[in-house]
Structures are given as structure tokens and as C-alpha cells.
Amino acid sequence: MLARKSIIPEEYVLARIAAENLRKPRIRDRLPKARFIAKSGACNLAHKNIREQGRFLQDIFTTLVDLKWRHTLVIFTMSFLCSWLLFAIMWWLVAFAHGDIYAYMEKGITEKSGLESAVCVTNVRSFTSAFLFSIEVQVTIGFGGRMMTEECPLAITVLILQNIVGLIINAVMLGCIFMKTAQAHRRAETLIFSRHAVIAVRNGKLCFMFRVGDLRKSMIISASVRIQVVKKTTTPEGEVVPIHQQDIPVDNPIESNNIFLVAPLIICHVIDKRSPLYDISATDLVNQDLEVIVILEGVVETTGITTQARTSYIAEEIQWGHRFVSIVTEEEGVYSVDYSKFGNTVRVAAPRCSARELDEKPSILIQTLQKSELSHQNSLRKRNSMRRNNSMRRSNSIRRNNSSLMVPKVQFMTPEGNQCPSES
């Protein structure tokens, strides 16, 4: 009754609210697509249920290099501490077995007591002094008040063994630290790719293009680019292949993937019959579950180490009907690169159909170019007309201002009745 008499506002009536909610379509948030290669080049792959963990210990050096820095530093510190403690126990046992500790406890601790010539290691009277002597032996920082004598052949054996173990630990751990700092992927941090790839017409063909550049002046020798398309496919027998990799060629006059990366380059792939993008149109691209992986390989000029940079483009990162802007200009005899426009694109005329349809009906490209030319001419006409209108408005406003600033002529009457104009 309250609703009928409009005492309750209509926006609070439950029946109306329920009807409006039913009319509104429920749009669920689309889950982000899992990509095989991240934009940074890291492999987005998780290894689970590995049973034979011992295989990693068979190649211990590679395992140490592949660890994270915090784990490597912990192992680096613990290896030295454990070796020092182990040999400190051995030195203390040598002194304990020879009776050096009891001798110092009975006769006192004096340098002139004559005990130094009768003990294995001088001034090793506790575990703390044995630990300090172990550090002095392995790190070779120089002997102070503690030194070894000729009294115990066992002490000489322990000394030789600790020196060998210390050299092995130094070689392995320092080599591991060096390899981690000089890894090839560090050089790949200055190899950059455009955030988006584009599909546009080049030389009458639909082409898939992206831009790659090098921020350093030192070059990448024998640089090559490989492109792969990864997508989920189903065989005629019904087998589902979750990661189907297919190489696609790079447009190069010498029919090779090698490039000369002295300046940012636009890598082009012609979408032809061999391309997996041959049957994909602009509308189909949005719903495609594919990933284009780009791999750049080469040799670092300064170190001679082979490096590799990777990135990928999913369907949402491919812009149809765009082209990269030019960023290389010549200034005073030197080529200049503006990296602020590295990933900038502009919209260009491109057919929305697939490359197959374009090959079957070449007139589609001609019609698209004609339409773009007409639209370009119309935009130029509108722009020129706007400029003319603006210029006319400016001229009219200037005339009005000038007319308002004009001084009116004043006439004076002479006694004889003649008019005499005043000079302004």
C-alpha cells in the first residue's frame, strides 16, 4: 500500500530494484592469460613433483650459480665458518692429545717458561685460541703469538690438509660469485623491446612488426632474432598439445635471421601462407589464445660471452593497423636516436581482414588505401577551412580594435560661420 501511494520513493522499491538488477548483464572479470615468457624475459614455468632431487647435486657448481643471491651468500659464509670450526676442533684435539693444554694449566702461561719448544702449537691453551689459529692458517693473515713447532708430525699433516681445503673452498666460492656477477643475462638488461607489436601493411603485404634496440655503445656481435608462436592446438587424433611451438621466418633480403644492431631496428615478419597468423583477422585476434615469443641472441663484444634476451607478445599486446614512429634522425652529421619515442605508434590504414582473404581479394587493399586517402583529404580540407575561418576571425577582430581606437574629427565654428576642421 505504501508503494502504491508513492509514500516510498521508487528507487527504494524492492521489486523495481530486483527488475533493474536482472536487466543488467553480469560481466565477470576475465582472468589474465598465463604467458609462457614474461615481458622481462623470465620463463613463467613452475617445476613440481621432481623426484630425483639428487641430480642437482651432481652438477653442484651450476646449482650454486643458479641459486638466488641470498642463498649463495649464506652458503659462502657457512662454508668458511664450518671449515674454520672443523679445523679448530682438530687443532684443539692435537693440543689435547699431546698434553699442551695441561702443560699450560700446570706451569702457567709465560713465554720464557720453555714450553714453546715442547708443544705442538704455541699459545693454544683453549678452544678459542684453537679457533683463532685455524683462521690464521686458512686465511693466511700471518701468525702472531700462535705458531706450529716441529714437535708433532700430526700437526704438520693437519696444516697441509687445511691449506688444501681452504684453496678448494676459495676457488669454488669465488668462482661462483664471479660467474653470478658476469652472467650473460646481465647484458640483456640493456637490450630492449617495444612493449607492443603491430600489424600493418608493408610493401603490399600484412606484416607483424616489433622494435628492438640496444642501449649500450658496445655492440652485440653476430646478433640474430628468432620468432616463435606458442599456442594450444589439437591434433586430428584428438590429442591436446598445450604448448605447440612453431618458428616463423623474419623478413630479411639475405634470407637469414642475423641483424646489425647498431641502432634500433623494426623486425618484420611477412604474414604469408607459412605463417601461423595467416588466417587471423583483426576481429579474430582479440579471441586468439596465442603468444609470440621473440629471442635475440648474440655475443657480447667486450666479454665474448653469448647473451640472450627474450620477450613475448600476447593477443592483447598486438595493435592492428598501427606503425612505429621514426626515432632516428640526422643531426650535424651524426645519427641521433630518441628513445623517448621507442614504443610510440601511429594509426595507419590497414585492412581488417586476414592475410588469406587479402591474397584472395587484392582489391580489399586498394579500397582501404583509397578510403584512407579520401579521409586524409577530407581532414586536410577541414583543417584548411578551420585555418581560413580562424584567420578571418582574427582579421575581423583586428579591424574592430582599430576602428575603436580611431580619434573622431572635431569641427569648430568661426565667427564668420565657416567650419574649420581641427587637426588631430
From Swiss-Prot:
Residues 95-126, 146-154 are extracellular. One of its GO terms (cellular component) is glutamatergic synapse. It catalyses: K(+)(in) = K(+)(out). It holds the Pfam family IRK_C. Its main location: membrane. The gene is Kcnj8. This is ATP-sensitive inward rectifier potassium channel 8. The modification Phosphoserine is found at residue 6. Residues 374-424 are annotated as: Disordered. The keyword Transmembrane helix applies. Inward rectifier potassium channels are characterized by a greater tendency to allow potassium to flow into the cell rather than out of it. Their voltage dependence is regulated by the concentration of extracellular potassium; as external potassium is raised, the voltage range of the channel opening shifts to more positive voltages. The inward rectification is mainly due to the blockage of outward current by internal magnesium. This channel is activated by internal ATP and can be blocked by external barium. Can form a sulfonyllurea-sensitive but ATP-insensitive potassium channel with ABCC9. One of its GO terms (molecular function) is ATPase-coupled monoatomic cation transmembrane transporter activity. It comes from the Eukaryota. Widely expressed, including in pancreatic islets, pituitary, skeletal muscle and heart. One of its GO terms (biological process) is CAMKK-AMPK signaling cascade. It comes from Rattus norvegicus. It is found in: Membrane. It is a multi-pass membrane protein. A motif (Selectivity filter) lies at residues 140-145. Residues 1-69, 177-424 are cytoplasmic. The chain crosses the membrane at residues 70-94, 155-176. Residues 127-138, 139-145 dip into the membrane without crossing it. Belongs to the inward rectifier-type potassium channel (TC 1.A.2.1) family. KCNJ8 subfamily.
